[in-house]
Amino acid sequence: MQAVAAKASTWTAGKNQRFHGMTLGEVKTLMGALPEPAEMKAGPRSNYPEELSLIPKNFDARKHWPQCPQIGHIRDQSTCGSCWAFGAVESMGDRLCIETNGTVQVELSTEDLLSCCLIQCGMGCNGGFPTGAWRFFKVCLEQSPPPPASRRV
């Protein structure tokens, strides 16, 4: 921990009580993002090195989008290796809020993703594929009819 703390410039390393008493193996079961199979990998990435100079030294999404108070909330995955699902639903909810300037504020269901996106997403609490979760959202959005006006958020 001291070696990590020596390199930290904007944060302080410390022990997290959440993992107190757990073995390394138990902690590793919580890291559920699996390496993606070749057929699932996203297409080629764009590289814009000239834009790297435009990246600010500090950026706090909570301050940049105050109309989206869910940004920065941390959910507890308990003993389930579902970080891949939590990350996907949290970022999708944040993106919906940002895109609509705060008019759509939803907490998407991690449980729904874990229960409904089976083969494409992985193995639930035993790990999964973040790309599969994003593809699942895309399919849902493309195939679902819009909700009636009375149910729209």
Regions found by a protein language model. Give the residues of each.
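Catalytic-core signature of thiol
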Residues: M1-V153
